[in-house]
């Protein structure tokens, strides 16, 4: 029996190896767990167009938004690990949503990491009526008047929400949470002065900052970004070690053969070095990343565990 098992295993491995050498020989479905037209979708379409050109096989974007990315991510989790169903996702679907699932799952075991596409910091902004010109001044105001300041978020459990929760934990302050359904209404109400504070992606507030309708205080990345060089980091503004970034990654289902992972990783790294892709990412205030699958796994693990601690400490419950 053992001999038959060994022969069968050898044959199976040979089939996988042969398939990997010809991969892809049919269209690849790339699940984007977000609606069409958003930042994630736009970046995904640009990258997958280049993959199509590189392999000579269609990489087709399939938008499956809903439940903060969980619906699209689940499709990939249940797919066959043959390389023909991939996940092009933001951090929200794989670092945040799993913490709010009815049956929490470990995304590090659910998916096979392929490559880190890029990352983008958030920006801490306040309405001009708030007399704070720096992070330290904002913290001082919040400490003097607990719960007097209200902050907007893109929704309960969103990156903007957990980033604000981390900020409050680190600064030792309290602010009132006002969740919205997406970034646009959160920005609109902050500009209108209905709420005072917001963590948002830079593209969504850049025009408002230039028009002095919002005041940007700092970026949430570990170091200053070339995309907004005039802004200090939150970390250098009084909260050492503070970091929160939106990031994008490509994954396959668990068990994706290493040969296919390596082919995809090599092709994606070439794509991410292309000037036109760098330009596309820059429009969303993002920088390309690249690297190995192991580097994405390490980055994802740290991000997932960090937000888990913040969510549990703040008592945040999913919608």
Predicted regions and their residues:
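Bacterial N-terminal signal peptides that target proteins for export
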Residues: 1-9
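N-terminal signal peptide c-region/cleavage motif recognized by signal peptidases
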Residues: 12-19
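N-terminal (or domain-start) structured segment
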Residues: 20-110, 148, 156, 172-199, ...
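An extracytoplasmic/periplasmic, membrane-proximal ligand-sensing/linker region
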Residues: 25-27, 169-173, 233-236, 258-319
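Short coil/turn segments
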Residues: 35-37, 91-92, 122, 127-132, ...
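Hinge/capping helix and adjacent helix->loop/strand transition within the periplasmic-binding protein
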Residues: 78-84, 98-185, 234, 247-280
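A ligand-binding cleft/hinge motif common to bilobed small-molecule-binding domains
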Residues: 92-102, 166-170, 197-231, 308
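C-terminal lobe and pocket-closing loops
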Residues: 119, 205-273, 302-305
């Amino acid at each position: 029996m053992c001999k038959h098992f060994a022969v069968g295993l050898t044959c199976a491995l040979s089939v996988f190896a042969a398939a990997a050498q010809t991969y892809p020989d049919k269209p690849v479905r790339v699940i984007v767990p977000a609606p069409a037209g958003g930042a994630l979708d736009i970046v995904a379409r640009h990258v997958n167009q280049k993959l199509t050109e590189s392999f000579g096989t269609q990489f087709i974007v399939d938008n499956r938004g809903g439940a903060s990315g969980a619906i699209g991510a689940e499709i990939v989790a249940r797919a066959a690990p043959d390389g023909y169903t991939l996940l092009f996702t933001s951090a929200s679907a794989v670092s945040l949503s799993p913490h709010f699932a009815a049956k929490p799952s470990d995304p590090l075991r659910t998916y096979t990491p392929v490559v880190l596409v890029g990352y983008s910091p958030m920006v801490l902004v306040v309405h001009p009526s708030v007399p704070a010109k720096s992070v330290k001044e904002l913290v001082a105001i919040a400490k003097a008047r607990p719960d007097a300041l209200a902050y907007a978020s893109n929704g309960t459990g969103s990156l903007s929400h957990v980033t604000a929760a981390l900020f409050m934990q680190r600064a030792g302050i309290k602010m009132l949470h006002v969740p919205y359904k997406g970034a646009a209404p959160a920005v609109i109400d902050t500009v209108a002065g209905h709420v005072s504070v917001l963590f948002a992606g830079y593209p969504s507030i850049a025009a408002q900052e230039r028009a002095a309708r919002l005041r940007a205080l700092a970026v949430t990345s570990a170091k200053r970004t070339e995309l907004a060089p005039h802004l200090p980091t939150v970390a250098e503004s009084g909260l050492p070690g503070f970091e929160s970034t939106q990031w994008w990654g490509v994954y396959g289902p668990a068990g994706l053969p290493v040969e296919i992972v390596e082919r995809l990783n090599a092709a994606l790294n070439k794509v991410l070095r292309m000037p036109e892709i760098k330009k596309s990412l820059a429009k969303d205030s993002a920088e390309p990343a690249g690297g190995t699958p192991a580097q994405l796994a390490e980055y994802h693990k740290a991000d997932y565990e960090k937000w888990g601690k913040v969510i549990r400490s703040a008592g945040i419950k999913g919608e």
